[in-house]
Swiss-Prot record:
Cellular component, GO annotation: cytoplasm
Protein's organism: Bartonella quintana (strain Toulouse)
Motif range ('HIGH' region): 8-18
Binding of ATP, residues: K252
Motif 'KMSKS' region positions after renumbering to this chain: 249-253
Record protein name field: Glutamate--tRNA ligase 1
Length: 459
């Protein structure tokens, strides 16, 4: 069975780029009757917070992503210790005592000599006495994984290609000789991303790893680690990254692009799903009404190979399109939560939905209709016309035909036409020069409010 995973770090709110990875994995699992694993990468105990774990869970639920299994890396340290010890015993994980400053100096020297800034494995030359000396100075080792890029002598590396058939990008090749041995364990004993990730992928029988293409180099290292652990390799797929319109990478520090924030702002769940999945693919970003329809058009191979820019304006447009098609029954509960209720609520929704970007925006129109309003006065030259319009307002309750009858009469009596006729009335009654059809608004306002507002604006 196909098994995929989404492994967020609960160190902040996840953004649209993160959720794009989650959706690609979720839809891929759905399309192949597979399983979706949620794995919290919370090995950084100090920065990982329960509030972010809760927020990630809430975001996934809102986006209709339902994990089949949930794991926490912080509960698996014993397993990582076991694997690390085995690698140490085999000489594949070795201690290094250089400080960050010393390593930085070496890199600068290598670059000045036009050499690649690859770690030279100097730690492998240390004698037991030298290691003891470092320990006596209070230095604690960090541990590097010995990449298999040599024949007999690890100090003499040779070109060693790691290849895989990426399900998105096709054949990929990484030369392990061009990479430094990765640090798997920090000085303090905490684990970096690589070892826990590979161990979990093995233990959880992950068959497909679908992630951003910023992990391509990591994949070469991880394949070497999979092989060192005598494990079957998963299938890899790397999708293009999203950036801001300025070309900057998305970050958890950009809270306005977090799913938590976008949800609070009133964006539709399916709008974010469609946008995240279809942007940067060969398909148009279409406003599918639900996830099942989106799934039918999901294809991992449609992903572009170039970076894609995320423009919030495009998400607004997509959201608007979806909101305009929502029926009253679909939003009835949400409107009630916004205190939009009563016998006129359905008529109200049908009147205004084409003029809002988000369901929450309906509140502005509801208040415009029901609350006492203080609008900017109409233009001085239009006030006599507004006063005059009162004389020709149809008698009795206002209905579907009232606006047409009223404006037809005004056209005949005043000679006004087009904007000169309609705009002063709209501004007098709503305070705006745009909005829903006035015929529908007239009914919602009711005769008494129409008379009151025209009287005030005609003064």
């Amino acid at each position: 069975m196909i098994k995929v995973r989404f492994a967020p770090s609960p160190t902040g709110y996840i953004h649209i780029g993160n959720i794009r990875i989650a959706l690609f994995n979720w839809l891929y699992a759905q399309a192949h009757n597979g399983a979706f694993i949620l794995r919290y990468d919370d090995t950084d105990v100090e920065r990982s917070k329960q509030e972010y774990i809760d927020a990630i869970a809430a975001d996934l639920e809102w986006l209709d992503i339902q994990p089949d299994e949930i794991y926490y890396q912080s509960k698996r340290f014993n397993r990582y210790d076991e694997v690390a010890e085995m690698l140490k015993q085999r000489g594949l994980l070795y201690p290094c005592y250089e400080t960050a400053e010393e390593l930085d100096r070496r890199r600068k020297i290598q670059l000045s000599r036009k050499l690649p800034p690859v770690y030279d494995r100097a730690a492998l030359k240390l004698t037991p006495e030298e290691k003891e000396e470092f320990e006596s100075q209070g230095r604690k080792p960090h541990w590097r994984f010995l990449l298999p890029n040599f024949e007999n002598n690890p100090l003499q590396t040779k070109r060693t290609e790691v290849c895989w058939n990426d399900v998105v990008k096709g054949k990929q090749t990484i030369d392990l000789a061009s990479l430094s041995d990765p640090v798997l364990i920090r000085e303090g004993g905490s684990y970096l991303y690589t070892l826990p990730s590979v161990v979990d992928d093995i233990d959880m029988a992950i068959t497909h790893i679908i992630r951003g293409d910023d992990h391509i180099t990591n994949t070469g290292v991880q394949i070497a680690l999979f092989e060192a652990l005598n494990a079957q390799l998963p299938i890899f797929g790397h999708i293009n990254l999203l950036t801001t319109v300025l070309g900057k990478g998305l970050s958890k520090r950009d809270n306005d692009l977090s799913i938590h924030s976008l949800r609070a702002e009133g964006f539709e769940s399916i709008a974010i799903q469609c946008f995240a999945v279809l942007i940067g693919t060969s398909q148009n970003v279409h406003p599918y009404p639900h996830q099942a329809a989106l799934l039918k058009h999901f294809n991992l191979q449609d992903t572009s190979r170039s970076v894609t820019k995320f423009d919030i304006a495009d998400l607004f447009a997509l959201n608007s399109h979806l909101v305009h098609d929502l029926t009253y029954e679909e939003v009835k509960t949400r409107l009630k939560n916004l205190s939009i209720d009563g016998e006129k609520a359905e008529c109200f929704w049908n009147a205004i939905r084409s003029n809002i970007d988000k369901v929450n925006d309906a509140v502005l129109w509801w208040k415009m209709i029901h609350d006492e309003q203080s609008f900017d006065p109409v233009a001085l030259e239009d006030r006599s016309f507004v006063r005059q319009s009162l004389n020709f307002l149809p008698e009795g309750p206002l209905n579907d035909e009232s606006w047409k009858v009223w404006t037809t009469t005004l056209k005949e009596k005043t000679g006004r036409r087009g904007k000169a006729l309609f705009m002063p009335l709209r501004q007098a009654l709503t305070g705006m020069d745009h909005g829903p059809e006035m015929g529908k608004l007239l009914q919602l306002l009711g005769r008494e409010k129409v008379i009151d507002r025209l009287t005030i604006q005609g003064e």
